[in-house]
C-alpha cells in the first residue's frame, strides 16, 4: 500500500533503472546510425519526476534522499507535508500533517541538496491539507487558525481541513518550490480555481501541478463534456504540470485481465492473435515498435558489439536466424 512501506532508496533505485532503459534505447538508436537532427530521431532522455514521499524522516533524511534522487537522474522531485511515520496515499484517510515550518525546511533541504550537487532540479511541494485533519504540533503560527482544540489518543492535534488550510500551506511553500500541488479528493475546477488564484496572488507566475488521479470516480463527479475540457481549464488556471498517477499500471492490469479472461474461455491463442498481435502490427504505422521485442530490448545492438569485437563477422549473432528476423520483418 501507498504508506512508505518500502526501503529509503527504493525510488532512487527505480529512477536509475528507468534512466538505464533510456540509455539503452539511445544506444540502440545510435547503433542504427540515427543521430540528433536526422529524420526519425527520438530524444529518449525524458525528464523523470520522482516521488520523495514525506522525505522519510527529518530534514537530513530529505537532504540525503534528494541527493540520491539527483544522482540517479531525477529531473524533478516532489515532497509532501505529511508525517513520514504515518504517511498515506493522498486519497486515504488518517493523514497527519507536519507543521508548515517543518515542511518548508524539507523543501529548503531539497534545494540545498540540489545546490550541493550542482544540478538544476525542479522541486514540487505538495500539500495534503485539503483532506488531512490531524497535525503533529500546535507551535506554528501558520497552523494555529485551523486548530480545533481537540487531540487524539496518539497525541495529534485536530485541524480544520479544506480549502483555506490548503491555501495557507500552498502560499507558504511557493517561495521554496518550483511547482505547488494540492492533493484533492475529487476533480473540482472550483476548488482548483480558488487555490490557484490565492497562490498566484501571493507568488505571481508560480507553476502549479494537478493530479488527475484514477482514485477519482470521474463520471460520478463530472459529465463527459466536463471531463473532456477539464485539463484545458486547469491549464488556463496555471496548472502546467498535470499527470495521471498509476495510469500505466491500470492500463497494464486491465488489458492483461481482459486477455486472460478471454484466453481462459477457450481457443487460447486465437485471443492472443486478435487482442494483442494483430493490433500490434496495425499500430506500427503510428510508431509502435515492440512487435519486434528482441530488437526493442537491444539484441541487435549487442550483435553489432559482438561483430566489432570479432573483427567484422560473427557466427553467433542472436538475431541472425531468429524467428523475429524471419517472421517479423
Indicate where each model-derived feature is located.
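Substrate-binding cleft of secreted/luminal carbohydrate-active enzymes
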Residues: 232-261, 267-299, 303
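Alpha/beta enzyme core
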Residues: 1-243, 257, 261, 299-329
Amino acid at each position: 500500500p501507498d504508506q512508505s512501506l518500502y526501503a529509503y532508496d527504493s525510488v532512487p533505485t527505480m529512477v536509475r533503472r528507468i534512466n538505464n532503459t533510456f540509455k539503452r534505447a539511445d544506444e540502440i538508436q545510435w547503433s542504427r546510425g540515427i543521430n540528433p537532427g536526422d529524420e526519425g530521431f527520438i530524444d529518449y532522455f525524458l525528464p523523470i519526476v520522482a516521488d520523495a514521499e514525506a522525505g522519510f524522516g527529518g530534514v537530513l533524511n530529505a537532504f540525503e534522499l534528494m541527493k540520491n534522487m539527483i544522482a540517479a537522474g531525477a529531473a524533478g522531485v516532489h515532497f509532501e507535508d505529511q508525517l513520514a511515520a504515518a504517511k498515506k496515499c493522498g486519497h486515504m484517510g488518517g493523514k497527519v500533517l507536519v507543521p508548515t515550518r517543518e515542511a518548508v525546511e524539507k523543501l529548503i533541504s531539497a534545494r540545498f541538496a540540489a545546490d550541493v550537487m550542482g544540478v538544476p532540479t525542479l522541486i514540487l511541494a505538495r500539500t495534503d491539507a485539503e483532506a488531512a485533519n490531524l497535525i503533529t504540533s500546535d507551535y506554528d503560527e501558520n497552523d494555529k487558525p485551523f486548530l480545533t482544540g481537540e487531540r487524539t489518543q496518539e497525541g495529534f492535534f485536530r485541524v480544520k481541513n479544506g480549502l483555506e488550510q490548503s491555501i495557507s500551506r500552498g502560499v507558504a511553500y511557493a517561495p521554496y518550490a518550483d511547482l505547488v500541488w494540492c492533493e484533492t479528493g475529487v476533480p473540482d475546477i472550483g476548488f482548483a480555481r480558488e487555490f490557484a488564484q490565492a497562490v498566484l496572488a501571493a507568488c505571481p507566475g508560480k507553476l502549479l501541478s494537478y493530479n488527475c488521479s484514477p482514485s477519482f470516480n470521474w463520471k460520478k463527479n463530472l459529465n463527459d463534456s466536463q471531463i473532456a475540457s477539464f485539463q484545458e481549464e486547469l491549464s488556463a488556471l496555471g496548472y502546467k504540470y498535470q499527470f495521471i498517477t498509476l495510469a500505466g499500471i491500470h492500463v497494464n492490469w486491465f488489458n492483461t485481465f481482459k486477455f486472460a479472461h478471454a484466453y481462459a474461455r477457450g481457443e487460447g491463442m486465437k485471443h492472443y492473435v486478435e487482442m494483442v498481435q494483430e493490433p500490434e502490427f496495425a499500430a506500427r504505422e503510428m510508431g509502435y515498435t515492440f512487435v519486434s521485442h528482441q530488437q526493442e530490448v537491444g539484441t541487435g545492438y549487442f550483435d553489432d558489439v559482438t561483430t566489432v569485437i570479432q573483427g567484422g563477422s560473427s557466427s553467433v549473432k542472436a538475431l541472425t536466424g531468429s524467428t523475429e528476423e524471419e517472421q517479423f520483418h
